[in-house]
């Protein structure tokens, strides 16, 4: 699912919580129903909502990163290389603006209004779509940490 989330979890485990767990790839989400004491899982996307409240502890990676570094975290960034046709970068900016302005319609069109969680609230209150200097500084810190975690994938 998200290599960034896997690496961020590795950073937090090593640098913030100062633990060195063994990592395994989750082969099947059914394993979550048979967790042993001491087991921990990284869940991403809709799976977070599907399993919410089933475990004694849960942590939001971005919130924990902010506690540890006092910086926001950017899980994804839209970028264009230097020299790219300005029409393309303008098109990316237009698509971003359109998406932000039509979030509610997208939630309805894709059936997320029928989910047991507030998809619109999540998309409008939990995600910041502007890449600013603080997020750039945070990404530099993250990249420079050198943390590499294996396995790098979850089922999905």
Question: What are the residue ranges of the model-derived segments?
Answer:
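Long, contiguous hydrophobic alpha-helical segments, chiefly transmembrane helices and signal peptides
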Residues: 2-13, 41-44, 74-78, 123, ...
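Pocket-lining segment of extracytoplasmic ligand-binding domains
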Residues: 25-109
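Conserved C-terminal helix/tail region of periplasmic/extracytoplasmic solute-binding proteins
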Residues: 151-156
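Short secondary-structure boundary micro-motifs
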Residues: 7, 61-63, 113
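Generic serine detector
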Residues: 2-5, 20, 58, 145, ...
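Bilobed "Venus flytrap"/periplasmic-binding protein-like clamshell domains
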Residues: 1-33, 37-39, 105, 137-140
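Secondary-structure end/capping motifs
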Residues: 84-145, 149
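Short, flexible coil/linker segments at or flanking structured domains
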Residues: 1, 11-14, 29, 66-68, ...
């Amino acid at each position: 699912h998200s290599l960034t989330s896997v690496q961020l979890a590795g950073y937090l485990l090593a640098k913030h919580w100062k633990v060195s767990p063994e990592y395994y790839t989750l082969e099947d989400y059914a394993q979550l129903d048979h967790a042993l004491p001491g087991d921990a899982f990284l869940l991403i996307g809709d799976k977070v909502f599907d399993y919410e409240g089933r475990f004694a502890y849960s942590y939001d990676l971005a919130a924990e990163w902010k506690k540890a570094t006092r910086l926001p975290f950017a899980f994804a960034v839209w970028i264009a290389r230097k020299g790219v046709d300005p029409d393309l970068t303008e098109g990316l900016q237009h698509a971003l603006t359109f998406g932000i302005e039509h979030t509610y319609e997208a939630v309805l069109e894709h059936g997320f209004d029928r989910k047991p969680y507030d998809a619109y609230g999540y998309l409008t209150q939990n995600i910041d779509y502007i890449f600013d200097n603080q997020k750039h500084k945070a990404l530099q810190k993250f990249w420079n940490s050198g943390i590499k975690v294996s396995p790098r994938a979850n089922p999905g």
